[in-house]
Amino acid sequence: GGGCSPGMRRFFDPRHYRAVLFDQRGCGRSTPNASVENNTTWDLVADIERIREALGIERWIVFGGSWGACLALLYAQAHPERVTRLVLRGVFTMTRAELDWFYGGGAGAFWPEQWQAFSQMVPAEERHDLIAAYHRRLFGADAAERVRFARAWAGWESALAVLDPGESRGSPASGYALAFARLENH
C-alpha cells in the first residue's frame, strides 16, 4: 500500500536489468490516491500485464515483496508464458492465519508496546476484529478520525517492518498514512 521508493532500486543492478517499478492503484504517485474503487486484486494483476504490454516486454522476471509477492504469484499464474522467473521477498499472501497473526495479537508478542498503541485505539468491545474496527474508521465520515487511525495503522505496519522492536521509523505523514492504511485494510 505504500508505493515505490528510490531505495527499492537497490535490489537491481542496472548494468544487468531493466527495472520497472510502479505504484499500484491508489498508492504512491498513482491517482486517485488512497482510492479503493475499481481496485481489486485482479485489477492489479491486469495492470501489471498492461504495463508489460505498454513497454513492449515479451517476457520478464517478476519481483515482488510483501503484498507485491502475492501479486507476483497471481500474475505468474495468470500469465505463465510472460514470466521467466519469480523473485519473492517477505511473502505475504493474505491468508486468514497471516491476518490473524498480524492483527490478532500474535505479532504483538514481539512488539508489545507498539501492539498496545495500535490495539488500544479501538474500544475494548471491538478488539476481537481490529481489521473491521479500523475499516469503519479509515472509511468513515470524520476526516480527523480517518487520519488518526491511518497513522496508527501505518505505525503498526512500520514497527513490523524492522528487526529491532526498539527501532522507530517515526510517525508517517498524514497523506501517506491514509493511502497506505486504506489500501492495506481494503
Q: Where would I find each of the regions flagged by the language model?
A:
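The serine-hydrolase catalytic nucleophile loop
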Residues: 1-13
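Short glycine-enriched nucleophile-adjacent loop
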Residues: 69-80, 86
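Conserved alpha/beta-hydrolase
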Residues: 12-32
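Conserved alpha/beta-hydrolase "nucleophile elbow" surrounding the catalytic nucleophile
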Residues: 60, 64-69
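Conserved acidic catalytic loop of the alpha/beta-hydrolase fold
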Residues: 42-61, 78
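Alpha/beta-hydrolase fold catalytic core
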Residues: 150-186
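A catalytic-pocket lid/entrance helix-loop region that shapes and gates access to the active site
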Residues: 81-134, 186
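Alpha/beta-hydrolase active-site loop signature
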Residues: 1-2, 24-28, 68, 92-93
